[in-house]
């Protein structure tokens, strides 16, 4: 069924101001500071994200309440939010970004804190099709999360707005096609297009939603937010965390790309100079062939959360964070965390979801619930540390400050390639680990005779919270010398600059 916020736009546009709230399609006044953020010499690449956020937050807050309903005993309040007009140099249409916002308020909701989950959706459908609401989390799942945690849950859709049309481009673009295209536009003129990468307006829309929630949830004094999102929406959640001090914790799902230069080099070498087929949009826009250029280094300054460690925004990366990755991600390698996890300051936990591809939506609620409950109860996360001790008898040493109720080792082997994608038929199996009285265990692992093996330790705690070690990949060689074999499209790779093959 089409949600009320999508079916009632014509009616809503005729509404007048009420309770200090503007109709959803009221004109957004021109804001010169927004243009300044795109190209002013005094705004550097590491400041553009925050500059744009601050400029948008200075604009009037434009939204309309469109209805109230009940979902399995939880009150749901629906809004239509206009977050911004975004069209650097007039290159993008439609410029106006609108979003369905659903706020789930459980009975006896705890005050001050809310969870904000960014989701997808198609607000501007292609010719001949209809607008589509978010497909990531059903209302029942969001209501269940609110009930289980006694926490207000906010679902923000249309991150990013899509499909978008770009000047001179005949193809309306969505998801990674849209992200990659904005990157290609940025790379052509970085100094003039610092607000061009699509994550910039995505992060600003998250901030606008926090402002809406503060106003509408004033009786609960909501002013602190836990951000969550998957893939590019998880990336935007990192960016919103950097830009907005109202964010007190972040849970990014399947966006295992901090320290972009090191991670991308590792990925290219792992695939024998090729790229996973999931990178198709970025390869088509020439992104993967520009990784060594000065322009890409400037993109990294803006895009890469880890680069903000060297800026005044370093403290924003110290908020509690629960990084959730997939063991068989279509985009990212299971051991990418080696390039960034230990460098992240502050309270943190890692979870690797075994036998999962990039689409991990079924695990989001069960992963979030114990994390949020611990925040609400002011209970610390378990402090976990792990190291690989190599040698003739390699071991993973795993230590937890809190005793788990279950401890197991997950492992998978690919005898042909350093490739652990779920789409390639790789499956992990688990082995129980005896608990150690002292909190530290040494877990034997093996270097396979052929190919590579991946290992991680998983700890489950009494409240259902799950924390894992980083994933360690062992083989007689660190990297292969050729691209992995494939027998179907989802498991293929794309030609890279250093590869001798086309599509394998």
Describe the residue ranges of each PLM region:
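Catalytic-loop region of hydrolases
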Residues: 28-111
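Glycine-rich nucleophile elbow surrounding the catalytic serine of serine-hydrolase chemistry
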Residues: 229-239
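Gly/Ser-rich "nucleophile elbow"/oxyanion-hole loop immediately N-terminal to the catalytic nucleophile
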Residues: 188-231, 247
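Surface beta-strand/loop "capping" patches
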Residues: 370-411, 430-439, 444-446
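Short, surface-exposed "cap/lid" segments of acyl-processing enzymes
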Residues: 93-169
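Cap/lid segment of the alpha/beta-hydrolase catalytic domain
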Residues: 124-134, 150-204, 257-273
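Serine-hydrolase catalytic core
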Residues: 294-356, 400-407, 416
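Hydrolase active-site cap/lid region
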Residues: 239-291, 351-354, 360-363
């Amino acid at each position: 069924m089409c949600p009320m916020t999508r079916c009632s736009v014509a009616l809503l546009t005729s509404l007048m101001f009420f309770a200090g709230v503007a109709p959803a399609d009221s004109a957004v006044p021109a804001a010169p500071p927004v243009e300044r953020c795109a190209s002013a010499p005094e705004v550097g690449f590491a400041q553009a994200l925050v500059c744009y956020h601050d400029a948008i937050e200075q604009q009037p807050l434009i939204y309309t309440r469109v209805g109230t309903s009940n979902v399995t005993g939880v009150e749901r309040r629906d809004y239509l939010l206009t977050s911004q007009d975004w069209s650097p140099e007039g290159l993008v249409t439609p410029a106006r970004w609108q979003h369905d916002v659903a706020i789930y308020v459980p009975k006896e909701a705890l005050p001050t804190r809310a969870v904000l989950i960014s989701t997808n959706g198609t607000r501007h459908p292609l010719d001949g099709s209809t607008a589509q609401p978010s497909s990531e989390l059903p209302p029942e799942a969001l209501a269940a999360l609110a009930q289980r945690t006694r926490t207000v849950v906010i679902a923000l859709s249309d991150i990013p707005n899509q499909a978008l049309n770009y000047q001179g481009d005949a193809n309306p673009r969505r998801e990674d096609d849209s992200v990659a295209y904005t990157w290609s536009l940025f790379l052509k003129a970085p100094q003039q297009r610092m607000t061009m990468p699509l994550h910039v307006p995505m992060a600003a829309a998250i901030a606008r939603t926090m402002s809406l929630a503060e106003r509408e949830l004033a009786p609960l004094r909501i002013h602190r937010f836990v951000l969550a999102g998957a893939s590019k929406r998880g990336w935007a959640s990192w960016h919103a965390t950097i830009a907005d001090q109202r964010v007190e914790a972040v849970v990014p799902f399947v966006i295992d790309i901090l320290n972009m230069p090191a991670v991308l080099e590792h990925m290219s070498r792992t695939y024998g100079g090729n790229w996973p087929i999931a990178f198709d949009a970025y390869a088509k826009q020439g992104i993967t062939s520009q990784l060594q250029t000065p322009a890409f280094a400037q993109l990294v300054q803006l895009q890469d959360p880890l680069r903000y460690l060297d800026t005044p925004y370093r403290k924003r990366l110290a908020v509690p964070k629960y990084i959730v990755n997939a063991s068989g991600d279509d985009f990212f390698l299971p051991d990418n965390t080696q390039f960034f996890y230990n460098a992240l300051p502050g309270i943190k936990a890692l979870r690797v979801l075994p036998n999962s591809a990039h689409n991990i939506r079924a695990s989001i609620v069960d992963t979030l619930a114990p994390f949020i409950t611990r925040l609400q109860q002011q209970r610390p996360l378990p402090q976990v540390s792990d190291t690989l001790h190599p040698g003739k008898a390699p071991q993973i040493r795993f230590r937890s400050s809190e005793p788990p109720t279950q401890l197991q080792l997950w492992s998978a082997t690919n005898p042909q390639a350093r490739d652990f994608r779920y789409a390639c038929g790789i499956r992990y199996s688990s082995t129980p680990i005896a608990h150690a009285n002292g909190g530290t265990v040494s877990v034997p692992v093996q270097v396979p005779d052929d190919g590579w093996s991946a290992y991680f330790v998983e700890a489950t705690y009494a409240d259902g919270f799950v924390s894992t070690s980083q994933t360690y990949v062992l083989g007689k060689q660190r990297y292969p010398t050729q691209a992995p074999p494939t027998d179907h499209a989802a498991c293929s790779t794309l030609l890279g600059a250093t590869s001798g093959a086309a599509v394998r």
